[in-house]
Amino acid sequence: MYLCLESLQKSEFANQRWSLVDTSIETFKAPPENTLKKRGQHVTVIYDQNAMNSMVYTLWKEVYYVDETETWHKTSSDLDYDGIFYIDNQGNKIYYVNFQDDAALYSNSGMGQVHFESKVLSPSVTSSLRVGSTGGQRGTQTGDHARGRSRPSPRSSRDARGRQQRAQSSSRSRSRSRSRSPTKGPHSSGRDTRLPSPGRPPGGRRRGTPERERCPGTPTPPTPDQVGGRSSTPKRQASSRLAQLIDAAYDPPVLLLQGAANTLKCFRRRATQAHPHKFLCMSTSWTWVSKTSPLKSGHRMLIAFSNSEQRNCFLASVRLPKGVSAVKGALDGL
């Protein structure tokens, strides 16, 4: 980071106004990585037309980067239905956020709506959040967009899907009526015999099942004894929301203690000596920075446990010092 700022100081952008946030390592490593950026704005992608199922990304209005000749360039970001990108000095479109990456994780249909400022981008017939497509640099587009055709409106897309569904339903009805025509033999009665269709019980009407069918590849839910029994971060992969919730149920439980710094330090020493088998690990005392509320004052200390039973045993057998409070929680990993 020091070498980057030293190079920036020798460039034509050295006299611009730079804040500590603009030149922090966190901003430098945020997408697009290894670049300086300013004026970030939020982009919201809503999946499956459900406002509760959405992701928020950052679009940077100003992006500063260094090319192969150690020359600094300034550009701006833009977005389309595929993701957020900027144009480099060679005219290449560089995507640093691909919406389909998270669509594979959070969307059932692989499609969503992109909301930015006053614009709403919806999928067209030939464009969608393509699950499994490669990310990175893209210079050309295929399909109707390459030929300059305009996208159909969301309403026309819904009408087309409705006509297609009605046509499929009508075709299925005709095939069922042909298969149900009575064929009487010497031993047949006056009532025609119908074979139940796949997935339907006899009688023709679909009945509710006592248990929800699990999709192939969905992991087995943990037992109560297994909840909180893992201390590593779940592997990020494309799976259903149910599979992610089951995977996260193994997250290790923790206790967050709040109190005076010296009180927490003494308690950690006593607990380590007297009750080392009743917890997994303890942190040092720490405080929140950039506090926006007086409720976040005071020192904190985290205690991690192997499972919920160990945490319950700790609370039942270890007495907290006076003035120390505890709240329960869980982490993705330790």
From Swiss-Prot:
Key words, A-Z: Activator, DNA replication, DNA-binding, Early protein, Host nucleus, Phosphoprotein, Repressor, Transcription, Transcription regulation
BP terms from Gene Ontology: DNA replication; DNA-templated transcription; regulation of DNA replication; viral DNA genome replication
PTM text: Phosphorylated.
InterPro entries referenced in this protein's UniProt entry, alphabetically: E2/EBNA1_C_sf, Nucleotide-bd_a/b_plait_sf, Papillomavirus_E2_C, PPV_E2_N, Reg_prot_E2, Regulatory_protein_E2_N, Regulatory_protein_E2_N_2
Top-level lineage group: Viruses
Region entry Transactivation domain, spans: 1-127
Compositionally biased region (Polar residues): 229-240
UniProt-recorded Gene Ontology molecular function terms: DNA binding; DNA-binding transcription factor activity; nucleotide binding
Assigned GO CC terms: host cell nucleus
Keyword Glycosyltransferase attached: no
Region (DNA-binding domain): 251-334
Chain segments carrying region Disordered: 127-240
SUPFAM superfamilies: E2 regulatory, transactivation domain, Viral DNA-binding domain
Cell compartment(s), UniProt: Host nucleus
Function field: Plays a role in the initiation of viral DNA replication. A dimer of E2 interacts with a dimer of E1 in order to improve specificity of E1 DNA binding activity. Once the complex recognizes and binds DNA at specific sites, the E2 dimer is removed from DNA. E2 also regulates viral transcription through binding to the E2RE response element (5'-ACCNNNNNNGGT-3') present in multiple copies in the regulatory regions of the viral genome. Activates or represses transcription depending on E2RE's position with regards to proximal promoter elements including the TATA-box.
Family: Belongs to the papillomaviridae E2 protein family.
Subunit field text: Binds DNA as homodimer. Interacts with protein E1; this interaction greatly increases E1 DNA-binding activity. Interacts with protein L1; this interaction enhances E2-dependent replication and transcription activation. Interacts with protein L2; this interaction inhibits E2 transcriptional activity but not DNA replication function E2. Interacts with protein E7; this interaction inhibits E7 oncogenic activity. Interacts with host TAF1; this interaction modulates E2-dependent transcriptional regulation. Interacts with host BRD4; this interaction mediates E2 transcriptional activation function.
Name of the featured protein: Regulatory protein E2
Organism per entry: Bos taurus papillomavirus 4
